[in-house]
A protein has these predicted regions:
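Bacterial Sec-dependent N-terminal signal peptides
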Residues: 1-12
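Beta-strand-enriched cores of mature, soluble protein domains
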Residues: 10-161
Length: 161
């Protein structure tokens, strides 16, 4: 019965449009020496200090503030890591923006049974409501990494339109 209701619902409602993406910025993050807290009730906890860096996009650019960290929790089988990076950025004109970036790293089999590596995250920005960057507060963002020199990570950030 549920399947027939679901099928009928699909036939009676318009399909949502596939979201588009708009490039927002590239963050070039410098990292400190990682350390391990150890096994916790939730999994193995690692912490990677965020020591600085820069960011640049069509509508903003500036620096990444030293003092944040990427808090990682590794599953018991070691295949899945949840990430929560918390840090602040400062625009070229002195506006501070808080960032909380949550994501997943997975290395294992995909739905087809093939070996897979997945690493994506969803940053949330908290810009001052009275600033010209307040538009960052009102959208969903996704990011994907690339790796370069040791001790660095680059994140490309897009706004879901």
């Amino acid at each position: 019965m549920f399947c027939s209701l679901s099928t009928n619902a699909q036939n009676n409602y318009p399909k949502a449009a596939t979201p588009e993406m708009e490039f927002v910025m590239q963050l070039n993050v410098t990292l400190g020496e990682a350390y391990t807290v150890g096994e916790t009730q939730s999994g193995k906890r690692h912490v990677i200090p965020i020591t600085g860096g820069t960011f640049e996009g069509p509508l903003l650019h500036g620096t990444i503030i030293n003092g944040g960290a990427d808090y990682q929790l590794v599953s018991a089988d070691g295949k899945r890591t949840t990430l929560e990076a918390i840090y602040s950025i400062r625009t070229h004109d002195g506006v501070y923006i808080h960032v909380r970036n949550q994501g997943i790293v997975y290395s294992g089999k995909d739905a087809s049974g093939n070996d897979s590596f997945y690493f994506k995250a969803a940053p949330k920005f908290e810009a001052p409501a009275d600033s010209k960057y307040s538009w960052l507060n009102n959208a969903i963002y996704v990011c994907a990494p690339s790796f370069g020199a040791p001790g660095t990570i680059t994140l490309d950030v897009w706004r879901v339109k």
